[in-house]
Amino acid sequence: LYDKGHLNAALIVSPKGVYTNWKNEQIQRHMPDHVLYKIVVWNPNPTKKEKEELNFLFEEKNVLTIFLMNIEAFSTKKGQDIATKFLLGHNAMFAIDESTTIKTPTAARTKAVVKLRQLAKYRRILTGSPVTKSPLDLYAQAEFLDPEFCLCVQV
């Protein structure tokens, strides 16, 4: 999608213990060599250097901008605000790693993530644990992907 000019950024959200793995391993392992990219990791209490990196998210550049956040950030206004600003400023993919973290439709972070989905040009979910306790566990994940998926169901 990046090579075809359809997107210029990605917001990747995962649990706290996992999201730094994206920076340290996953992105460089799977990114094609010809793609120039910059990774910025969310920290709710950034150092001076981290503040400069956060500012990079909103500057025009010719690289793929990747913003990594933990899912817990969406329980806070600060986290929601920066994710909103990022998505509004880019043609972005919004990806949720370990998407079972948004399985509870009534949870604050699930509501925040689902609300922000409309700002992303593309959405993806990833999970290594597709087994659920109930079919309703899939509802919020499906709603994140496609807002029209469950038009007749109200939770």
Language model features: what each stretch is:
Residues 2-109, 115-121, 149, 153-155:
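SF2 helicase/translocase NTPase motor core
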Residues 120-135, 143:
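Conserved helicase ATPase motor motifs in RecA-like P-loop NTPase domains
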